[in-house]
Amino acid sequence: MADRHNRDLDRKPAPLPEALPVPCVDSHAHLEIVTNTDAESPEVGAVLEEAASVGINRVIQVGYSAEQSEWSVRCAEKWNTKVLAAVA
């Protein structure tokens, strides 16, 4: 996707935090920015698995434009037990 919020794409990800004591939901995510891939890509699944490893078992994927909202819906369709789509 072309729109990446002017982020530094070369920066290294932060280390993972300790796992949460109970399962939680990430209430506002932009997986399209993190992965820069198609919604159905295995890279999205890898990010979801990484989140699960620290206690985030569900993600609300927020679309902020028509294109990102469509991406969010495709993502929720593909990863339906782990992702819900929302529109901001």
Feature roles, as predicted:
Residues M1-A88:
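Mid-domain alpha/beta scaffold segments of enzyme catalytic cores
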